[in-house]
Amino acid sequence: MMEENRAEQLFFLWEKISEGEIRLLRVFGEQPVVTVPGFIDGRCVRELGDYCFSRRKLPENEIRYSRYCGGMWESGLFVSKDKVKNNCIASEQGNAAENIVSLEAIEQDEKLRELSEKYIKEVQLPADIVKIGSCAFYNCTKMERISVYPKLVEVGSDAFMNCLNLRSLQMCAGVEEPTGLKQLLAQIKWQVEVSFEQEDGEREAVLLYPEYYESYDEIGPAHIFELNLTGEGFRARQCFKDGVILLNAYDEIFPQACVEESAEVLIPMAWNRLYTACGLPPEARAAYETYVREQSGKVLTILLKKRELKPLHFFFEKGYGRKEQIEDAVAIASHEEWMEGVASLIAWKRQLFAEQTETADVRSRYAFEEF
């Protein structure tokens, strides 16, 4: 689990939940992307504490630290200030068995940054975490992606408050497994893409959850308020049963979403379901395909910007794109100096549109002979 962090130094502050389990309180590192280890100091990481990735006051309980650097671990007692550290050392009466580190000492290390708020960008949580505390990622305005496992079932209030750049949520689970995704989505009202990925990185399903808005209307002089919900994102977030996502219910939202949502929302909704078509019934497939064909120009533009060959080939192979569009794509890829894309597109044109080309050549020959 720590292979991703091997080249850097990491500091973890934590407290005991039990003898074998801990709650993570703070993380310091050299990079804005971090993989939280499954075990620290021989104890299983079970929870993210309140305000874990936010610059807030630490709890008053006994706090321990663990330092990871170059594949080696060091652990000991954490104190808030050097003065407290000196008092602790004095009280040990020369017993140097316990390492003691202060917050001031950590902050003096020029390589280390507190992974919080405007610095943290991506977090990979370990498999055994069951809880994210309240406001754990409060004000992490630069965070773009978080990866979690199915054991995570409890998410505290406002866990992702002001994390408006968080647009990607990776579930390291199968789409038919019970997970805590519903609890996570309840804390993310803005648009977010969720991918269900296996250990080999294969995406089993990718779902887009649109943004939704809440407003209240006052009814009469009794000060009774009626909740109004705008956007299909709320309904999409309710498509679960016993922690398992109901794909059919999610697909049934699309026709109404076509009325309320913009193309920027509908295109990834439709494309993701077609490209990772896990549990996709024929009627839903037909609705998604109709929309993708209607928006084929915009879809192609998005795919070309990503420079990914597999989805681009899928687009033309399934007949969502026309012959003139693949010719336009060749011109665009050439202009952008994407030579791999140019070569692939030319090959696909010959392979997928050969019959059209031959028919056109025959017609041209007959027309020339008649002339």
Roles of regions detected by a PLM:
Residues 2-3, 9-21, 28-46, 58-131, ...:
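Structural signature of tandem-repeat unit edges
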Residues 48-50:
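Extracellular beta-strand-rich solenoid/capping regions of secreted or surface-exposed proteins
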Residues 287-295, 320-327, 340, 350-363:
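Ankyrin repeat arrays, specifically the small/polar loop and inter-repeat linker segments at the C-terminal end
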Residues 302-303, 329, 333:
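Ankyrin-repeat helical register
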Residues 323, 366-371:
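Extended, charge-rich intrinsically disordered regulatory tails
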Residues 271-288, 310-312:
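Repeat-mediated protein-protein interaction surfaces in helical alpha-solenoids
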Residues 308-316, 338-347, 354:
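Ankyrin repeat structural motif
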